[in-house]
Amino acid sequence: MTTLVVLTVVCAASPAATERQITFTPKNHHLDNNDNFSPDGRFLCYDTRETLGPGIENSQSIEKVEIVTGVEALLYTPGSSVTGTEAAPGVGAVSYCAQGDTVAFIHGPPLDQVNDRGYYAKPNRNGMEVVADGSGKHVWLDRRDTVATRETIPGAHRGGTHRHEYTLDGRRIGFTYDDVLLPQYGRTIGYMEPHPNAPEGATHYVTLLVPVVPERTAQPGEIEYAAGDSWVGREGLMRAFIGKVRAEDGESYEESLFVVDVPRDVDITTAYPGSATRLPSPPEGVRIRRLTHAHAEGIVRGTPEGDRIAYYAIAADGTRQVFIIASDGATPPIQATHFPHGVDSGLRWHPSGNTLFCISHNGVAATCVKPGERFGETVFLTPQGDTPERFALA
């Protein structure tokens, strides 16, 4: 079973902090690299995948735990479900909203829709929002419309949304997306926002942000796949992502860091909703910028102020390290970490923008990224190494 461990940092300059297990119930507690802390820092939200079977499709509940007491609370569970290799609905990948006591997460097809929609799958899921007070009060964020004989309902999507991430001001929600009507198109990204013209049954109007081309058909510079996305800044005016793009030789591919500019006043209703033969396209005024031509990977992370983006890349010594680049692309990327064993995962900014956190060699580390003499200085906040107990906490 997966348990949650909280790290208490007594002093950022100390070589180690205190780890404390906070969950003990006999089920999995999965964070999924999302925005799991409540706005007041009291709770962590999680799903329970892998308890009854593999994957989100077998997760039966969305829950939270109070960090100080370890008390767990159920936030949402489907009324009925089926588990196994063909499962539904499946709920998971939960994130808190920074501006209210709500969480958003993936919700697969309700059982009464399985005959029409099929079982849980990547292109067969919606976003749901639940009030995190234990009342179970919930709304559907988006509407799914897969009718192939007409254009898609404006503001709806035709597949599955995933990894729902609120902006820090709570106004927009970003997501990754898989299309069911045109499966020859790879994963891409989009966003949604509350709108009076949201389709019936949903609170938000949906649009894609990156118009990918069908797999294995890209011309040099065209994007076939977009993922690893996160907001840059508080207001959702930029969304950074990793794009798989055809190289200039017309044969090979590159994975590079991109940014989508989403103006504050963009009219989301100018987006094309798509049809059985055309993928949806972004609203007017959205612009895509390529920031790197060297390899980039992972889930990228932007500062709250929106001035810098952190991502993973391969250093000169062949290890995976954290690099930083200005969000406007005005300066070249800078290598921020120099871990002998490279970086594993868990990349996050401190709210100040002066420190990055990540996992290396099964330990949690903090790296100073404030410009100046201390840039790149790193301290491990936990023990590290290859011992069984470290693997258990990784």
Regions found by a protein language model. Give the residues of each.
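Bacterial N-terminal signal peptides
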Residues: 1-10
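Sequence signature of WD/YWTD-type beta-propeller architectures
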Residues: 15-394
